[in-house]
Amino acid sequence: LLLHCFGLRVGELLNLRIGDIDFAESTIAIRRRANDKTDPRVYQPLVKTCERKLIADTKLMFEISDYILNDRRKIKNSNKHDFLFITYKAGKTQGQPISFSSYHKVVSVVRQSSSLLGGLTGHKLRHTWNYEFSKAIDKNQDISDEKEQQIRSYLMGWRPGSETSMIYNRRHIFELSKKTALEQQEQLFKGEFDE
């Protein structure tokens, strides 16, 4: 859910701690924690670029709170750290922060649950978030291209002025170019262009 709502990177998701969540303000902080001595994982998840604070809908905050209070806390050893996502499988790692390999297993199970999800990856949800963001911006005529770029870069954790958005925005740009080209051709066949 968080991958889709925020377009998070896997490392950002696995790096989340309960303390990063401010339920009073409805925000989630994405923080850099390189070489975290409190993280027991061999391959520690990292926040690749900029730290940021994301605003969350109250329904999403309720879901996170419900998970923490009614699900996560019941798992043995989960109270020994505050990483949000933990391992449920019984054994020596139960209650520990979820690893990259466990995360990929969870995504694989989700992918196999429906033929519609056959190509699902966490990173595709990041692309989906950017596509949906572009469509939402198109509906809001008050936001300039420059402001759109600034907002997108902040929300995605990119440095100001980053060109990375072009990679994530290809599908939306393709759809806009297709629509524009077809409108232009339609006008041509109607004889609406000036000679």
What feature does the model see in each segment?
Residues L3, L14, S153:
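The alpha-helix within a helix-turn-helix
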Residues L8-V10, C50-L54, S65, D71-R72, ...:
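Short, cationic motifs built from Arg/Lys/His that form the positively charged side of catalytic pockets
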Residues P40-V42, K92-S99, D138-E146:
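Short, flexible/disordered intra-domain loops and linkers
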Residues D57-G118:
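Active-site/catalytic core of tyrosine-dependent DNA strand-transfer enzymes
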Residues H104-Y154, W158-S162:
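Short, basic (Lys/Arg/His-rich) helix/loop patches that form interaction surfaces
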Residues M156-E186:
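Catalytic-site neighborhood detector that most strongly recognizes the C-terminal catalytic loop/helix
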